[in-house]
From Swiss-Prot:
Residue ranges, annotated region (G1): 15-22
Name recorded for this polypeptide: GTPase Era
Quaternary structure and interacting proteins, as annotated: Monomer.
Protein localization: Cytoplasm; Cell inner membrane
Region (G2): 41-45
Membrane topology of the entry: Peripheral membrane protein
A single BP term in Gene Ontology: ribosomal small subunit assembly
Summary of the function given for this chain in its UniProt record: An essential GTPase that binds both GDP and GTP, with rapid nucleotide exchange. Plays a role in 16S rRNA processing and 30S ribosomal subunit biogenesis and possibly also in cell cycle regulation and energy metabolism.
Cell membrane recorded as keyword: yes
Family stated for the protein in its record: Belongs to the TRAFAC class TrmE-Era-EngA-EngB-Septin-like GTPase superfamily. Era GTPase family.
Annotated spans, G4: 124-127
Length: 300
C-alpha cells in the first residue's frame, strides 16, 4: 500500500458544554483517554485521540464546549475551538445535545454555517429521547445547516452508533500519509493526563464554583517500575476560602480526592503510584494573563 491509497485527517468535534464530546472521544479511542464529568466545562484544551484502520488514520479533536466567555481562560478556550475548525479540520463533527434547548445551539450553528469542510452531525444521548423528537431536531438542523454530510443518532455513553460514524468519517478524509506513527494514540504526555484525571475527580467530588476555579500542576512524576512510583501535584484555587473546602475537615476531603484520583491514574497508566496532593492559592488565575502563560494556556 502506498500513501496514495491511505487516508488521514483531523475530525474536529464541536458542541455545547456537557454535550458528550469527551465521552465520544473515549468511545472512538476505545479507552478512558479524556477526563469526563457530569458537570459542564470539563475540557479546557484541545485533546486528540487517534483511530486507525488498515487504510486510514482519523485524528479526533475534542475541543472545549462552545460558550460565552466570561473571563480570559474562557476566551482562550473559545479561540481554540475556532482555530481548530477554521485551520485544522478536514471534517467537522457537531455533537448536538437534545437535553438542551435547540435555541441554546443557535450561535454554534451560526459558526458552523461558515466552515469549508464536510460536516457530520451527531445527535448524542439518543437513547434518552423519543425518536419523534430526534427526527424533528434532525429536520430543523437540515434547514439551518443544509450542507450536512450525514446525521447520526448515537449514544456515546453506550457506544451505540459510534462505529458507523467512524466508518463514514474515514471514507470522507482526504488522501494523505499518516500524521502519526502507527500505534500512537494521542499527542499528549502522561503528565497531562495525570493532571486531567485529578481535575476530573475534583469535578466529581466538589460542588458549586470550586471545580471551575481549580488548576492542577504535576510537579513530580517519577517511575522505577516498582513500589516507589511517585506523583506530586499541586491544586491551585483562586481564593483562600476555597482552600479549606478542597482540604476538608482534618484533611478528609483531600484524602478522598487522593484515593479516587490515584485509582483513576493507575487504571489509565497500568501501574501503581503513590500520589501526593498540595493546595495553593493563585488569586484570580483564570483572568490573569501572567498565570495563564505560566499554566501553558497562552504560549506566545
Amino acid at each position: 500500500m502506498t500513501d496514495k491509497d491511505f487516508k488521514s485527517g483531523f475530525a474536529v468535534m464541536a458542541g455545547l458544554p456537557n454535550a458528550g464530546k469527551s465521552t465520544l472521544l473515549n468511545a472512538v479511542a476505545g479507552g478512558l483517554l479524556s477526563a469526563v464529568s457530569p458537570k459542564p466545562q470539563m475540557t479546557r484544551q484541545n485533546i486528540i485521540a487517534l483511530s486507525e484502520g488498515e487504510k486510514h488514520q482519523i485524528i479526533f479533536v475534542d475541543t472545549p464546549g462552545f460558550l460565552e466567555a466570561k473571563y480570559k481562560l474562557q476566551e482562550i478556550m473559545k479561540g481554540s475551538l475556532s482555530q481548530a475548525l477554521e485551520e485544522d479540520a478536514d471534517v467537522a463533527v457537531f455533537v448536538f445535545d437534545p437535553l438542551q434547548e435547540y435555541s441554546a445551539h443557535k450561535k454554534l450553528i451560526s459558526k458552523l454555517q461558515n466552515i469549508k469542510c464536510p460536516l457530520f452531525v451527531l445527535i448524542n444521548k439518543a437513547d434518552t429521547q423519543p425518536v419523534e423528537k430526534l427526527r424533528k431536531i434532525e429536520e430543523q438542523l437540515k434547514k439551518d445547516l443544509p450542507d450536512i454530510e450525514k446525521t447520526f443518532f448515537i449514544s456515546a455513553k453506550q457506544n451505540k452508533g459510534v462505529a458507523e460514524f467512524k466508518t463514514a468519517v474515514a471514507e470522507t478524509l482526504p488522501f494523505n500519509p499518516p500524521y502519526f506513527p502507527q500505534g500512537q494514540w494521542t499527542d499528549r504526555w502522561e503528565r497531562f493526563y495525570v493532571a486531567e484525571f485529578i481535575r476530573e475527580q475534583i469535578f466529581n467530588l466538589y460542588e458549586k464554583e470550586v471545580p471551575y476555579c481549580t488548576y492542577v500542576e504535576v510537579e513530580t512524576f517519577t517511575e522505577d517500575l516498582g513500589p516507589k512510583n511517585y506523583i506530586k501535584a499541586k491544586i491551585y484555587v483562586e481564593r483562600e476560602s476555597q482552600k479549606p473546602i478542597i482540604i476538608g475537615s482534618k484533611g478528609s476531603s483531600i484524602a478522598k480526592l487522593r484515593v479516587s484520583a490515584q485509582k483513576r491514574i493507575e487504571e489509565f497508566l497500568g501501574r501503581k503510584y503513590r500520589l501526593e496532593l498540595e493546595v495553593s492559592v493563585e488569586p484570580q488565575w483564570r483572568s490573569s494573563k501572567k498565570c495563564l502563560q505560566k499554566f501553558g494556556f497562552i504560549t506566545e
